[in-house]
């Protein structure tokens, strides 16, 4: 029997969270697998925690302070799980991601095929099944099209990610320097630097709609004061965290350049958008 801890962090998305958990528990039982769910409630005010406790009493709910966001909320859940048991693997799951049937079985098979020594990632698609939204990432940032076989990737989105015990013992937890985003990308890039492998499963494992393509911090239709505020929010493009990430993985020159361009995009979003558009003959 293998034991996995499923990790989530949630904030005011009650219906999506309940659907996410329903899709997860609907897959049970799975032969030779037992799961425990650790969920960080980061200050929900919409009744999410109460609904989860009522409908899924086995879920262990941890109370955040409302300022954890994704990365630190996942970190809280992960530490609680690791403190409670020496799990064989840890499954990251976003609360807006709805697993397809046999996802757990597919992950099991991938772990066996890689001898439990690689991070396993699942791709997601939009509700219309028309495009890939999240998953493993190639060097250029693209999500590889699932073709039936395990596909090596360079890093990943944290929607569906299985971290086996072998990997956890080498890499440890998500880096708590990050508040919201970049923690998942950072974990993948650290894994590659450590010589560990990352594979995306050869079929789409779930549904998750893509977030808006233009963030508020660089959207020309948003007033400057709001853009500046959103730039520095954890779920914007916080310059210090961005610099830390870029310096760690791409060097000081790239980090300094991107620190500058992030501010230019916030200050002059229309000019930046025009600058990035391909020129026509």
Segments from the language model and where they lie:
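Non-catalytic, C-terminal membrane-associated alpha-helical segments of glycosyltransferases
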Residues: 213-214, 218-281
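A recurrent flexible, glycine/aromatic-enriched loop bordering the glycosyltransferase active site
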Residues: 143-163, 230
